[in-house]
C-alpha cells in the first residue's frame, strides 16, 4: 500500500492516507481470503500504531470483491473508505464479523475504548454465517455511512453498544 499525508482545516486534524492498490488484494485464489486479511489488517495495524487524535489515518480500498476468513480489527482515529463497487465477503463460520472495534480481549468500560472511527461505503456480505457484519463497543465518535450490508441471518447488521456519539 502507499502512504501520503494531508492536512484538514477543521480542528487542525492532519490525515495520513493508506491506499491499498489494485493487485494488493486478491479476488480469487486458494489463499485469497487469508492473504486479503493480512494486507487489510496490516493497514489497520499501521493506523493503530501511528494514528492520534490530531493525526488520523484514512484507508482506501480498490474496487472489487474481496473475501476474508476472520474478523478485521479497526482501531481509534481510523477512517475506512470503500468504493460503491467494493464488496467484502466473510467466508468464516459463525462468530466472525467483517469488522469490529479493536481487540475485545482489551477490557473497556463506559466510552473509554476506541474513538474517531469512520466507515464509509462498500457492500458487506456476511453469507448468512449467523454473525453481525460490524461490531462496536465502548466507543466515542463512531460514524457509519453509505454501507450496504447483505445476507445476514440470526444476527444484527450493525451491533453498537456503549457508544457515545454514533452516526449511521
Q: Positions of the model-derived regions?
A:
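Internal alpha-helical scaffold/solenoid segments in large eukaryotic proteins
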Residues: 62, 78, 142, 150-157
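N-terminal extracellular ligand-recognition/capping segment immediately after the signal peptide
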Residues: 31-37, 53-104, 124-130
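Glycine- and acidic/polar-rich repeat regions and solenoidal domains
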Residues: 95-114, 124-136, 150-160, 165-167
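Short, T/G/N/S-enriched strand-turn elements that build extracellular solenoid repeat scaffolds
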Residues: 41-50, 67-76, 91-92, 107-111, ...
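Extended beta-solenoid/beta-helix repeat architectures
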Residues: 38, 76, 113, 140-145, ...
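C-terminal segment of classical bacterial N-terminal signal peptides
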Residues: 2-9
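All-beta strand scaffolds that present successive hydrophobic residues in beta-strands
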Residues: 61, 80-83, 114-121, 142-146, ...
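Right-handed parallel beta-helix/beta-solenoid
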Residues: 10-41
Amino acid at each position: 500500500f502507499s502512504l501520503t499525508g494531508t492536512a484538514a482545516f477543521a480542528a487542525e486534524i492532519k490525515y495520513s492516507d493508506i491506499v491499498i492498490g489494485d493487485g494488493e488484494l486478491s479476488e480469487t485464489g486458494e489463499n485469497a481470503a487469508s492473504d486479503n486479511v493480512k494486507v487489510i489488517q496490516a493497514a489497520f495495524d499501521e493506523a493503530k500504531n501511528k494514528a492520534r487524535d490530531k493525526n488520523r489515518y484514512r484507508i482506501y480500498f480498490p474496487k472489487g470483491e474481496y473475501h476474508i476468513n476472520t474478523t478485521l480489527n479497526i482501531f481509534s482515529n481510523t477512517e475506512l473508505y470503500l468504493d460503491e463497487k467494493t464488496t467484502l465477503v466473510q467466508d468464516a463460520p459463525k462468530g466472525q464479523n467483517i469488522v469490529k472495534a479493536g481487540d475485545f480481549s482489551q477490557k473497556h468500560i463506559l466510552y473509554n475504548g476506541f474513538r474517531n472511527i469512520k466507515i464509509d461505503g462498500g457492500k458487506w456480505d456476511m453469507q448468512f454465517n449467523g454473525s453481525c457484519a460490524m461490531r462496536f463497543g465502548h466507543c466515542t465518535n463512531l460514524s457509519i455511512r453509505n454501507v450496504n450490508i447483505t445476507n445476514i441471518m440470526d444476527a444484527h447488521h450493525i451491533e453498537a453498544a456503549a457508544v457515545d456519539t454514533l452516526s449511521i
